[in-house]
């Protein structure tokens, strides 16, 4: 099997069928309590994919080879799920802010949900435009319920393929599984947001120059298999397992060879999310 080198999404450091019922009724009050998001609006929603590959020389950040594979894979996956996909390439930090501000001002009243995918270099709490960093909190804040009223009560998903630090996970041999205490970034508790990070806080995120990033490969694969069968958090758990068990870095630099990765999901969703209805 041909090996191609893995890279990290950080600044350069050196050169049987089960039926699922989507609601329940309180036996005491007789009030219908819907446990899943309403996904039968006229439109599924927008999926914005920001794919930053080439960076200004002043940033000192290398090109992100393999990211175009991710962008194409995501476009196909979410188009098949009936989302209106908009791909944007090589945006500056100012352009990213302006784009998401503009999208948040659109009328989403006929849309079931919103998805934003960020493919770039990053650090903890930061994503990079082609000319420098921007706070993730600033970008997600445009879609808060008090700012984007037409998405209030609807699921807002942010999928982030980027490094969150410079730690490397060497992995551990096990025959029974391990339990790690992973403390995620403190995020404001606005309801109905979900953040799917490619890696745990403080760690590198790996990307293959030929096949794309481990996380996006796995996410698209699991969505293709299970989007019409499983709830989204269950799908993401399978993504976590796939990344954790099926990938290991290959690098000509011994310090970066044989490393592992685990995605991190931060959910403030208040209902179950199914991509079918």
From Swiss-Prot:
| Residue list for modification Phosphoserine | 26
Question: Please, which domain of life does this record's source organism belong to?
Answer: Eukaryota
Stored Pfam families: Peptidase_C14
Phosphoprotein among the record's keywords?
A: yes
Q: Spell out the subcellular localization from the entry.
A: Cytoplasm
List of residues that carry S-nitrosocysteine:
163
Q: Which residues carry this modification: N-acetylmethionine?
A: 1
Report the transmembrane regions from the record: none
Summarize subunit and interaction data from the UniProt record for this chain. Heterotetramer that consists of two anti-parallel arranged heterodimers, each one formed by a 17 kDa (p17) and a 12 kDa (p12) subunit. Interacts with BIRC6/bruce.
The record describes the protein's role as: Involved in the activation cascade of caspases responsible for apoptosis execution. At the onset of apoptosis, it proteolytically cleaves poly(ADP-ribose) polymerase PARP1 at a '216-Asp-|-Gly-217' bond. Cleaves and activates sterol regulatory element binding proteins (SREBPs) between the basic helix-loop-helix leucine zipper domain and the membrane attachment domain. Cleaves and activates caspase-6, -7 and -9 (CASP6, CASP7 and CASP9, respectively). Cleaves and inactivates interleukin-18 (IL18). Triggers cell adhesion in sympathetic neurons through RET cleavage.
Q: Which family does it belong to?
A: Belongs to the peptidase C14A family.
Name of the protein this chain belongs to: Caspase-3
Q: Which organism is it from?
A: Felis catus (Cat)
Q: List the gene name.
A: CASP3
């Amino acid at each position: 099997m041909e090996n191609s080198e893995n890279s990290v999404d950080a600044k350069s450091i050196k050169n049987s069928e089960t039926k699922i019922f989507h609601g329940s009724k309180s036996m005491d009050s007789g009030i219908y309590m819907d446990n899943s998001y309403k996904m039968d609006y006229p439109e599924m929603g927008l999926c914005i994919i920001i794919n930053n590959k080439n960076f200004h020389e002043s940033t000192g950040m290398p090109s992100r080879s393999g990211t175009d594979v991710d962008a194409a894979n995501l476009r196909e996956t979410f188009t098949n799920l009936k989302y209106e996909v908009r791909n944007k390439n090589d945006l500056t930090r100012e352009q990213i802010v302006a784009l998401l501000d503009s999208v948040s001002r659109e009328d989403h009243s006929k849309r079931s949900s919103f998805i934003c995918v960020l493919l770039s270099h990053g650090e903890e709490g930061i994503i990079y435009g082609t000319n420098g960093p921007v706070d993730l909190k600033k970008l997600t804040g445009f879609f808060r319920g008090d700012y984007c009223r037409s998405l209030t009560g609807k699921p807002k998903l942010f999928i982030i393929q980027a490094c969150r630090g410079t730690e490397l996970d060497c992995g551990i041999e096990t025959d029974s599984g391990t339990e790690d205490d992973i403390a995620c970034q403190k995020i404001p508790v606005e309801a109905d947001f979900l953040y799917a990070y490619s890696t745990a806080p403080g760690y590198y995120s790996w990307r293959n120059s030929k096949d794309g990033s481990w996380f996006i490969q796995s996410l698209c694969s699991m969505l293709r298999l299970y989007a019409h069968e499983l709830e989204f958090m269950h799908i993401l758990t399978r993504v976590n397992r796939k990344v954790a068990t099926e990938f290991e870095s290959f690098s000509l630099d011994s310090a970066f060879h044989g490393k592992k990765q685990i995605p991190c999901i931060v959910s403030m969703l208040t209902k179950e999310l199914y991509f079918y209805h």
